[in-house]
Every structure is written in structure tokens, then in C-alpha cells.
């Protein structure tokens, strides 16, 4: 059916209005500020929705529009109607995205990351698995080291054992692997049984988001007590409006 002249006029007016709105949002030629904006750590500079100027990509939970685009490298898309009261748009994860969110940052499927220098994690199927990088063994007092203690070493991630003498005077580092005869427990000979002894895993260190749980166990090649740690997730932290979610597990 052919439209009437009145219908044609209405359609033409609508096109003119849309063109005017886009012209206001996307000026021609491009007029961009110099120097470009400085983005927070981990936030990339991207072209705006007009393909004109470089802007800081919007992060998870932040408002977005045609000009202020979401960080596509983190699997974020601009979802209309996701703002307060169903108004506006927010940067959210795509429904089919299998990335992981840790401490307010997103990681892709298969990507490895370290939320702390003592832990290495891998993103898998929307979750993550982690392994500790520091030994958590327990040094028992011995004849040649009656007061072993673990200390933080400047410039190193993992604490180290030292043998304190005289209230901290004359401390000497203990070797990473004990010698054949030094008072330290060596690994068990083959065939010697080691009765398993472990405490229950303690509560998660955080009420929401990524945390740490600990226990004491002798399940190691030395058959001696050590403090073991593993990551825990009590429940996801609720996203904060206008800001990237934060986590204080580390």
C-alpha cells in the first residue's frame, strides 16, 4: 500500500530528527581534547561510539551510551534499561560470556592471573582454580634452631624461615631444603607409613567475594604439620552502582 503525502512527510521529519540527534552526539569533523584522558590502571583507551575520539572504556556496572562504550576486551556490553529504576544503560557481562571476575577485574577463558603474588589462578568455564606459590610448612624447634620463626623479606613475595637467637639477634636463614643432618625433618623413606592428620577447613576470611580458608595437615612428603590454604567464595559480592565491584580478600 502506498503511503499518503502526510505519511511521507512524517517519515521525512523523523529521519531529520534522528540525523540531528546523531549530529549532536557525533560532531563532524571530530573535535577531540588533547592530550587524551588518563584512564585508571587496567582501563584501556578506546574509540568512542562515533569512531571519533579516544575515551576511557567503561567498566562493569558503570553507565554507558552511544559515546561512552564498554570495555569489549572484558566481555562487557551496554545493556539498556539496566540503570536505576530501569532507566539508562549499564555495562554488564554478555550472557554467553565465560570470563571470570576477581577483585573487580575480568579475565578471559583460559587466562592465568595472580590476584596476589603468592597465588596463581586460571579462568575456566566462568570460574577459576588457584594454586599456592609459597610453601606453608611448619618448622618445629630443634637442637640447632630452638626458636625458628618466619619473617617477611623485603623484595620477596614469600616469607622465609630464620633461626632467631637472643631475641632476634644474630638471625640466620634456614635452607629451603634441610641437609642430611641438621635437626630438620627430612622426607620419609619409602615404605614408612604416615598416619593422616588434618583439621577441618576454617571459615572463609571474607563474607562475600574471594577469600582464604586455612587448615593444619601433615599430608606432605615430610609428614609434618603445615598450614595449608585454599581459596573460598562464600557468595558473590553485590555490584555497586557506577563503580567496579571491589574485593578485599588480598
From Swiss-Prot:
Protein's GO biological process: cell adhesion; cell-cell signaling; positive regulation of cell differentiation; signal transduction
Tissue: Expressed in primary osteoblasts, fibroblasts, ovary, testes, and heart.
PROSITE patterns hit by this protein: IGFBP_N_1 (PS00222), IGFBP_N_2 (PS51323), TSP1 (PS50092), VWFC_1 (PS01208), VWFC_2 (PS50184)
GO molecular function terms noted in the UniProt entry: heparin binding; integrin binding
The entry's keywords: Cell adhesion, Disulfide bond, Secreted, Signal
UniProt xrefs under SUPFAM superfamilies: Growth factor receptor domain, TSP-1 type 1 repeat
Domain annotation VWFC: ranges: 98-164
A single cellular component GO annotation: extracellular matrix
Domain IGFBP N-terminal span(s) in chain numbering: 24-103
Disulfide partners: 26-50, 30-52, 32-53, 39-56, 64-78, 70-100
TSP type-1 domain residues: 194-238
Pfam family, one: VWC
Superkingdom of the organism of origin: Eukaryota
SMART domains tied to this protein: IB (SM00121), TSP1 (SM00209), VWC (SM00214)
InterPro entries reported in the protein's UniProt record: CCN, Growth_fac_rcpt_cys_sf, IGFBP-like, Insulin_GF-bd_Cys-rich_CS, TSP1_CCN, TSP1_rpt, TSP1_rpt_sf, VWF_dom
Signal sequence segment: 1-23
Protein family (similarity comment): Belongs to the CCN family.
Protein name: CCN family member 5
Organism: Homo sapiens (Human)
